[in-house]
A protein has these predicted regions:
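Hot-dog-fold acyl-thioester-processing enzymes
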Residues: 1-54
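HotDog/MaoC-like acyl-thioester-processing domains
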Residues: 1-4, 54, 59, 63-65, ...
């Protein structure tokens, strides 16, 4: 399991005062970088060999600016050319968001 600490930015909040739903995709992409490096250690975009086929999020609790979040990432399934990742966002030790992403290696 991979773990990444992220400090939410004020610009990631919305009018309701919590982190905007669009922000999670950015956080999950950052959390996937170590996995990308397994396929492309130098992250050379001209030799990129992964494509996202699916992504879904479940928003369980609000996340707020000013408190660090922990993003945990794990490989949950491996197929012939694809693999599934599970992401989880925790703030103050509470699971706030879970996500599933399917990447295809070509």
């Amino acid at each position: 399991m991979l773990t990444q600490n992220i400090m939410p930015r004020f610009s990631e909040t919305d009018a309701l005062g919590h982190i905007n739903n669009n922000t999670y995709g950015v956080w999950f992409e950052a959390a996937r970088e170590p996995i990308y490096k397994l396929f492309l250690p130098n992250l050379n975009i001209k030799k990129w060999c992964l494509v996202m086929a699916h992504s879904s999020n479940d928003f369980l609790k609000e996340v707020f600016w000013g408190e660090e979040v922990i993003v945990k990432t794990a490989v949950s399934k491996i197929g012939n050319s694809s693999f599934e990742l599970k992401h989880a966002v925790y703030q103050k030790g509470v699971l706030c968001t879970s996500s599933k992403t399917v990447l295809i290696h070509y």
